[in-house]
Amino acid sequence: MAENDVDNELLDYEDDEVETAAGADGTEAPAKKDVKGSYVSIHSSGFRDFLLKPELLRAIVDCGFEHPSEVQHECIPQAILGMDVLCQAKSGMGKTAVFVLATLQQLEPVTGQVSVLVMCHTRELAFQISKEYERFSKYMPNVKVAVFFGGLSIKKDEEVLKKNCPHIVVGTPGRILALARNKSLNLKHIKHFILDECDKMLEQLDMRRDVQEIFRMTPHEKQVMMFSATLSKEIRPVCRKFMQDPMEIFVDDETKLTLHGLQQYYVKLKDNEKNRKLFDLLDVLEFNQVVIFVKSVQRCIALAQLLVEQNFPAIAIHRGMPQEERLSRYQQFKDFQRRILVATNLFGRGMDIERVNIAFNYDMPEDSDTYLHRVARAGRFGTKGLAITFVSDENDAKILNDVQDRFEVNISELPDEIDISSYIEQTR
């Protein structure tokens, strides 16, 4: 395992491994707007109403988007005018598209100048955001995008910046800071500064220091946008310090975990009964793709191996493997080459795999925030999904009660039979 490879970088800050950096999850923020239980709200107005560039509209049509979601409807009109934005919205509501479209709309590419900087807390999320930029800039051939994160050679990054300087840079704070300090990355022309899953970066003091140092290297006059699914009352003032009179949008209701179309159940069992129960459920449930969350790297490796031995097409992703391997496996799963993914919390936040319709908490998450991020992997984009949580001791039961109390949701015991139409889209 490439432990040193990972630990030498001030980057990965994964939830499941305390020794890299102390995990500090934010708490859900109070609502300013009630979404009335609709997960991806449909607005009659289309993207055309935002008066976007024709090249962007063509790419949006190619991606199959017809109507903006609630968060897009609220944010995009202000964001494309260059306003600072602080936005909290549930997972899967299309936050990424807000800043991708808003920055591409305003971008006037200048050769050799980086004008957009997007940072997030994990390499996988950085990789995914860079792919979104590529998707939406499909008809903007002059726009160059690059992604920089630790675990891969910094020399290659320096080479890219020197020979083929991007207009848009996506990355993790540790690597971005290293490139800025050694003068490879010039931040003097930044016009848009974006933090995705901002609470993750600003709650951890070492990462916050990196972000602050990078921020100070950018011009005073710029647009700042921050997004997250969880934004505690404590972290909001920290976010505001980076901004000038931001528009604040909270498209959420903290008291309800109404992930639209998501069925949630628990199973009481002993720890040594989990494998048998999991195999039985994978046999009887209909699924497109499944994500199974475990609490450690060792359990992740062992369970994936066991599933393969039982003829379940599983693949594992955890922070103990080299970066190239992780990205390659993520892409394999995304491309539907494997239907079952076993993962640590590394995969629990911000990852978009449209075909996932079942999420298992094989091991109970450590708190209600992590529960939200994990189960939101199923039933994203307003589709149906199923979340099943294994409860094996009193601590597990306590966390499940916390989830139910906090989100005012009733998670009932898994029945013997579940109506397939309740958790999978029926195609006729």
Swiss-Prot record:
Name of this protein: Spliceosome RNA helicase Ddx39b
Disulfide-bonded cysteines: none
Molecular-function annotations in GO: ATP binding; ATP hydrolysis activity; ATP-dependent activity, acting on RNA; ATP-dependent protein binding; identical protein binding; mRNA binding; protein-containing complex binding; RNA helicase activity
Main function: Involved in nuclear export of spliced and unspliced mRNA. Component of the TREX complex which is thought to couple mRNA transcription, processing and nuclear export, and specifically associates with spliced mRNA and not with unspliced pre-mRNA. The TREX complex is recruited to spliced mRNAs by a transcription-independent mechanism, binds to mRNA upstream of the exon-junction complex (EJC) and is recruited in a splicing- and cap-dependent manner to a region near the 5' end of the mRNA where it functions in mRNA export to the cytoplasm via the TAP/NXF1 pathway.
Residues where Phosphothreonine is found: 172
Annotated positions of the N6-acetyllysine modification: 36
Description of how the protein assembles with itself and partners: Homodimer, and heterodimer with DDX39A. DDX39B interacts with the THO subcomplex to form the THO-DDX39B complex which multimerizes into a 28-subunit tetrameric assembly. Component of the transcription/export (TREX) complex at least composed of ALYREF/THOC4, DDX39B, SARNP/CIP29, CHTOP and the THO subcomplex; in the complex interacts with THOC2. THOC1-THOC2-THOC3-DDX39B subcomplex is sufficient for the interaction with export factor NXF1-NXT1. TREX seems to have a dynamic structure involving ATP-dependent remodeling.
Subcellular location: Nucleus; Nucleus speckle; Cytoplasm
Comment text on domains: The helicase C-terminal domain mediates interaction with ALYREF/THOC4.
The keyword Nucleus belongs to this UniProt entry's keyword annotation: yes
PROSITE patterns in UniProt: HELICASE_ATP_BIND_1 (PS51192), HELICASE_CTER (PS51194), Q_MOTIF (PS51195)
Biased composition (Acidic residues): 1-19
Annotated ranges, domain Helicase ATP-binding: 76-249
Reaction equation(s) it catalyzes: ATP + H2O = ADP + phosphate + H(+)
Positions of crosslink type Glycyl lysine isopeptide (Lys-Gly) (interchain with G-Cter in SUMO2): 36
The EC number(s) this enzyme carries: 3.6.4.13
GO biological process, one term: spliceosomal complex assembly
Tissue-wise expression: Highly expressed in liver.
